[in-house]
């Protein structure tokens, strides 16, 4: 399932954020995406400045100089991509938007498949919350899956900040989380079939 801690904060026990990202990508695509959105925000919080990123993000790792250079290069590459894609202040990298597209395609495929009754039930249970969230977003052009991911990410940020969360929001997040957990498992199943180790 999508763990609030793992999806919202880097785990200091791993040697590098890039390793965490790769592990999450293999294990749970939803956690990977939420993690990468947080990385984008951390890069923005450091003004996409290579020196600041090294001081605040890279320096916290107790690793060899070679590994530290690779971590710094990973952040630099992401910051460069953010600049070139024009998402310095907001928005998501194309590599991350592509994951949302893949998840949305799988979501639609599962809903069309009459044998996928579990996913359909999870979706229809979460649908009233999704509709409310879409209405609150001010008509932003988002797919249902992007709406769900954005809601979950917003919830994780609130938790990080220690902000209060209403019972209605908690229930919506619980329903959405169940649906996204199932979607992530299906994504992994399909990926394991098409890309066996």
Regions found by a protein language model. Give the residues of each.
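Short, charged, amphipathic alpha-helical segments
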Residues: 55-56, 97, 124, 170
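Charge-rich, solvent-exposed alpha-helical interaction surfaces
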Residues: 74-77, 102, 125, 129, ...
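A charged, amphipathic interaction segment
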Residues: 93-153
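N-terminal interaction modules that seed assembly of large macromolecular complexes
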Residues: 19-90
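A structural motif
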Residues: 20, 62, 70, 79-83, ...
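Intrinsic-disorder-associated, low-complexity terminal segments enriched in Asp/Asn/His/Tyr and depleted
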Residues: 11-13
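Glycine-rich, aromatic-bearing surface loops/beta-hairpins
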Residues: 131-197
